[in-house]
Amino acid sequence: MNPKNKLAEMPVRPLLYTMAVPLMLSLLIQSLYNIVDSIFVARLSETALTAASLVYAIQFLMIAIGVGTAVGLNALLSRKLGQKKPEEACRAATTGLFLMLGTSLVFTLVGLLFSNQIAAALTNDPELQQLCREYLSVNLVFCWGIFLQTYGQRLLQAVGDTVLSMVSLIIGAVVNIILDPIMIFGLLGCPAMGIRGAAIATVIGQLIGAAAALWFNRVKNPVIHVRLKDYRFRWQDVADIYRVGLPTIVMQAIGSVMTFAVNGILLGVSSAAVAFFGIYYKLQNFLMMPVNGLGQAVIPVVGFNYGSEQSDRVKQAWEVLLPTGVVFALCGTAVFLLFPAQLLGLFSASDEMLAFGVPALRIISVTFLFAVITILCGYFASGLGNGVVNMIGAALRQLVVLLPCLWLLIRTMGIDRAWFAFWMSEVIACAYSLWATKKELRNKGK
């Protein structure tokens, strides 16, 4: 079936699921190699794992800009295709490529010029600073891979081809996972590079994944092509991309700020607490990847059918989305409730970390249902062209409510009960996101 016909005619439930499953698998694999990185780094030392956790806040900011730009581009391309304007879609895709390349250049310069200063801002400990600098500089200087890989995947997703999007990510992930132990520990004649080796393995995997995604677009994407000949830059395309993309960038960047701030709060408790939060965050991201895959799939479905004025299909997508997400949330909660010690054990957790980490994982897991609803509401609203719902929901759950509550509870009730701050933030964010998305659906689904 032609990609455009599939988005317009295929029954919504199977359409959403067939698009979502490859995305879920690709995101799970992407998250898995982040976890594999941490598992190998943890075998170096808990200090190395703490350094990787501190740097993750900066990596997350970089990913935020790339993903946000790609989400905005994806939504715009889907609407243009739904409006039967393929030439405008191709022009927007070319503009998106220039935006990604420009952003990559900025982060490369930051890595070359400011890695020492960033490491100093993350921690006062000299050993941690050195490890942070080694890990961060490689990821920043060679960031081209993650931006171009994200770009290529979103072009494929915009026409409904989530399978090739998944394959490109799998290629990069497999390369990364194979290279990790070789470069970290010095296997097969490669010098042992420690935490720097983990970073090098990551960027090589990203660059190869990017090459695969761009190649698939060149030979397999039947609709969207980058065209430099007769290309005319239009600020309106940039505005349309960032109307949805900027709130998503802010939303993702909020996660970076949250990670940085929580690490700062937890450093006052112990370095083990920082290492634990880094582990939790990656485990939670792994379990949430099916939800993000479902959310990414709904953007082109909603965007295309909203653009083609098929409001009944937009409403059907909403009716399928949340119940499916709830199932994933309950499964994730069950895993965290039943196997917290085993999950932490994957990362060579110390006795100190296990003492507060096991109850912490159980406390936080209860909030997954509310988090899933908030996340999916944000994706759905983005498909309708409104990225603000996503941004405000993220701000409430990760910044505005969470940080002051966590800071207060640590000082008044100690580390063991501080994790109840997640309950407060997730419930408030969920209530807002449901209200705002239903309002958007009423206004645009008429």
Regions found by a protein language model. Give the residues of each.
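Short alpha-helical transmembrane segments in multi-pass integral membrane proteins
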Residues: 1-20, 77-144, 190-246, 302-367, ...
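Short runs within selected transmembrane alpha-helices of multi-pass transporters and secretion channels
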Residues: 70, 138-157, 165-173, 198-213, ...
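Residue-level signal for short hydrophobic patches within transmembrane helices
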Residues: 13-32, 36, 58-65, 141, ...
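Hydrophobic transmembrane alpha-helices of multi-pass small-molecule transporters
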Residues: 61-64, 176-181, 210-214, 286-289, ...
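Interfacial/gating helices of multi-pass transporter permease domains
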Residues: 18, 41-60, 126-131, 195-196, ...
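Small-residue-rich hydrophobic transmembrane alpha-helices
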Residues: 49-109, 146-165, 276-338, 371-393
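Helix-terminus/linker motif at the lipid-water interface of multi-pass membrane proteins
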Residues: 28, 32-50, 119-126, 182-193, ...
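Transmembrane helical elements of multi-pass membrane transporters/channels
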Residues: 18-37, 138, 149, 172, ...
